[in-house]
A protein has these predicted regions:
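Active-site rim/loop-helix segments in enzyme catalytic domains that contact anionic ligands
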Residues: 1-48, 84
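Metal-dependent de-N-acetylase/amidase catalytic core
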Residues: 31-192
Length: 192
């Protein structure tokens, strides 16, 4: 309950107008039914119809947290299955249409947090300039997660100042493309 409240406070601070919490218990996502969780994410992809999906890498991202690793695994599979006519047929028979988001990115970084589980961060394939002010706003939003307070000092120390870029790894795309460093996650995306 407290983690949900922290998440909602963080979203409110950022001005997010729609957020959903799927109700899985903190630190227990690895015990959830794979097809159920992926199905819930497929449902949201089909309803919201995003062009780009962002998630953690399957190593758990910067923190190496098991829930983050599972979120990455579930989101990766949902990215693949949301566009298929042979997955979650009950959603399609209820009137939803399949939807193939065009790109899937994993959040990544060029540093590691000390005293965390070892991770294998994916190669940076996109550097998005966000500016110091936006990055600082992101950090302040993170600070609404009071239960994560022990990480704050380590994160600040690891950042070594206020970065101005966010880093991502292009994990999948619907259209073949040459490997290159992108500056915009919507580069090459075709509008519906």
């Amino acid at each position: 309950m407290i983690r949900t409240q922290e998440f909602q406070a963080s979203c409110k601070f950022l001005g997010v107008t729609h957020e959903e919490v799927l109700g899985y218990l903190d630190s227990k996502l690895d015990r959830a039914n794979f097809h159920d969780v992926v199905g819930e994410l497929v449902l949201r992809i089909r309803k919201l119809r995003p062009q780009v999906v962002l998630t953690f890498g399957q190593d758990g991202g910067l923190t190496g947290h098991a829930d983050h690793a599972m979120a990455g695994a579930f989101a990766t599979q949902a990215f693949e299955w949301a566009g298929r006519p042979d997955r979650y047929l009950e959603q399609l028979s209820s009137g939803l249409q399949q939807h193939a988001a065009q790109k899937l990115y994993y959040a990544t970084a060029d540093f590691k947090l000390p005293d965390r589980m070892p991770t294998s961060p994916p190669t940076v394939t996109a550097r998005v300039e966000v500016g110091a002010e936006r990055f600082e706003r992101k950090i302040k939003a993170f600070m609404h997660h009071k239960t994560q307070e022990p990480l704050f000092a380590r994160l600040r120390m690891s950042l070594g100042g206020m970065p101005t870029t966010e880093m991502f790894h292009l994990a999948a795309t619907r259209e073949p493309q040459e490997a290159r460093l992108e500056g915009d996650l919507f580069e090459g995306v075709v509008s519906d």
